[in-house]
């Protein structure tokens, strides 16, 4: 079991209309993880960064998942907000995500800037705002990497060592 916070980045959705967030909430609970916080924020870098900085300081939080703001338009700035607080990038996540997306949406997959990083010993996964994108990311990557029993390795078993100096 891991403790997860979910941040939806959007200019148009509310908790009631956030389909991608609802999908992730369901998948988090089905996997027996704990959703300890959920927020919606506008596509504004300072507001996104403020919430992320607050969350990475929480001792009872392991993972932050964001949905939305990973495309190419002018308002899509989630990766930029995350980059400002990043300790280490996890490039394989975005690469694998785009490979999985390619199987579903073809070359349109290259328009996603989904990414993953470490910040203050916490994983941050930035997913697209589409329901298909969050489903691909969870079912194809996160479901396995957030399972302590997944072999040969997984993100969970690294928790104790993420803050090593």
Describe the residue ranges of each PLM region.
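Non-catalytic beta/alpha edge segments that cap or flank active sites
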Residues: 1-165
């Amino acid at each position: 079991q891991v403790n997860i916070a979910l941040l939806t980045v959007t200019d148009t959705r509310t908790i009631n209309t956030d389909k991608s967030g609802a999908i992730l909430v369901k998948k988090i609970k089905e996997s027996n993880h704990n959703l300890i916080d959920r927020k919606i924020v506008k596509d504004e870098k300072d507001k996104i960064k403020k919430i992320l900085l607050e969350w990475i300081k929480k001792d009872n939080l392991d993972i932050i998942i964001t949905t939305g703001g990973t495309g190419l338009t002018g308002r899509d700035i989630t990766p930029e907000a995350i980059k400002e607080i990043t300790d280490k990038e996890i490039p394989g996540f975005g690469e694998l995500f785009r490979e999985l997306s390619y199987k579903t949406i073809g070359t349109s997959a290259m328009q996603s800037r989904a990414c993953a990083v470490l910040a203050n010993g916490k994983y941050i996964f930035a997913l697209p705002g589409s329901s298909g994108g969050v489903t691909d990311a969870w079912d194809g990557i996160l479901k396995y990497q957030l399972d302590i029993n997944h072999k040969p390795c997984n993100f969970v078993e690294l928790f104790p060592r993420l803050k090593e100096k």
